[in-house]
Swiss-Prot record:
Source domain of life: Bacteria
Higher taxonomy: Bacteria, Bacillati, Mycoplasmatota, Mollicutes, Mycoplasmataceae
Name of the protein this chain belongs to: Glucosamine-6-phosphate deaminase
NCBIfam families: nagB (TIGR00502)
HAMAP family recorded: GlcN6P_deamin (MF_01241)
InterPro entries (alphabetical): Glc/Gal-6P_isomerase, GlcN6P_deaminase-like, Glucosamine6P_isomerase, Glucosamine6P_isomerase_CS, NagB/RpiA_transferase-like
Organism listed in the record: Mycoplasma mycoides subsp. mycoides SC (strain CCUG 32753 / NCTC 10114 / PG1)
C-alpha cells in the first residue's frame, strides 16, 4: 500500500485526478472503475477541468460503476446513474455506450456484470471511497471476501449516512446491487480516497488493522497495487504521520 497524506480535501482531489489522468494518458482506452458519494465529487470536477483544458480525452475510456441502489428509477436524482451524468459524464467526451452501471438488467444474474468487466479485459484503475464502517462499494461488514457482484442489504448505519441525500430516511433504498469484494480486488490498480474525521477509524483499520470481515476494507491489504490518498483529518488516528 502507498499512503499519501495531504492537508485538505482539495489537495486530495487534485492528486487523485492527476493519477487518473496519467492512467488515461498512458492508456487512452483505459477501463476505469468509478465510485459515487460525496468523496469523489471534487476529483470529478478536476477531471472535467482537465478535459476542458484539453489535457485529457475520455473518448476511448470504458467505465464500470461500483454499485447502484436496487429498484430505483435511473432518472431519480438519487440514482447513481443520475449522479454520474451530473457529476462527470455530461461534461466530458466519454462514449455513453461505454459507461456501465449495475442496473435492473443484472438483478437476475448479478455476476454477468463481472463477466462484462472480464470481457473488457478487467479494470485498470478502480476508484474507491470508504464508509465509516469500512465498507467499500456496498460491501458491508461480514461480507464475503470472495464475493462477486451481488444484491446486498444495506446496514442501518449506511442507510442513515446516505439519508442526507434524500428528503427523509424512509426514502433511502434498503438494498443495492454492488460489485463484490473479489470484484474490486480483481482490478489491476486501486485508488482509495478519504477525507474528514469521520473516516479516521475506518482508515486506521484499513492501514493498521488485521484483515477481518468486520472491516471489509482490510481485504485491500492483500492487493499488490493500492494507493490511499487522505487528508490529515482522515489520518488523525494514525500516529507519527505528517501531511505531504
Amino acid at each position: 500500500m502507498k499512503l499519501i497524506v495531504l492537508e485538505n480535501e482539495e489537495q486530495v482531489a487534485n492528486k487523485a485526478a492527476q493519477i487518473i489522468s496519467e492512467q488515461i494518458k498512458n492508456k487512452p482506452n483505459s477501463v476505469l472503475g468509478l465510485a459515487t458519494g460525496s468523496t469523489p465529487i471534487n476529483t470529478y470536477k478536476k477531471l472535467i477541468q482537465m478535459y476542458q483544458e484539453k489535457q485529457i480525452s475520455f473518448k476511448d475510456v470504458i467505465s464500470f460503476n461500483l454499485d447502484e441502489y436496487k429498484d430505483i428509477d435511473k432518472n431519480n436524482k438519487q440514482s447513481y446513474y443520475y449522479f454520474m451524468k451530473e457529476q462527470l459524464f455530461n461534461y466530458i467526451d466519454i462514449n455513453k455506450n461505454n459507461c456501465y452501471i449495475p442496473n435492473a438488467s443484472f438483478y437476475d444474474n448479478p455476476i454477468a456484470y463481472d463477466e462484462l468487466i472480464k470481457k473488457a479485459n478487467g479494470i485498470d484503475l478502480q476508484l474507491l471511497g470508504i464508509g465509516i464502517n469500512g465498507h467499500i462499494g456496498f460491501n458491508e461488514p461480514d461480507s464475503s471476501f470472495d464475493s462477486l457482484t451481488q444484491i446486498v442489504d444495506l446496514t442501518n448505519s449506511t442507510i442513515k449516512a446516505n439519508s442526507r441525500f434524500f428528503d427523509s430516511i424512509d426514502q433511502v433504498p434498503t438494498q443495492a446491487i454492488s460489485m463484490g469484494l473479489q470484484s474490486i480486488m480483481n482490478a489491476k490498480k486501486i485508488l482509495l480516497l478519504a477525507t474528514g474525521i469521520n473516516k479516521s477509524e475506518a482508515i486506521y483499520h484499513l492501514i493498521k488493522g488485521q484483515i477481518t470481515k468486520k472491516w471489509p476494507c482490510t481485504i485491500l491489504q492483500k492487493h499488490n497495487d493500492v494507493t490511499i490518498i487522505i487528508d490529515k483529518n482522515a489520518a488523525s488516528k494514525l500516529t507519527n504521520l505528517k501531511a505531504n
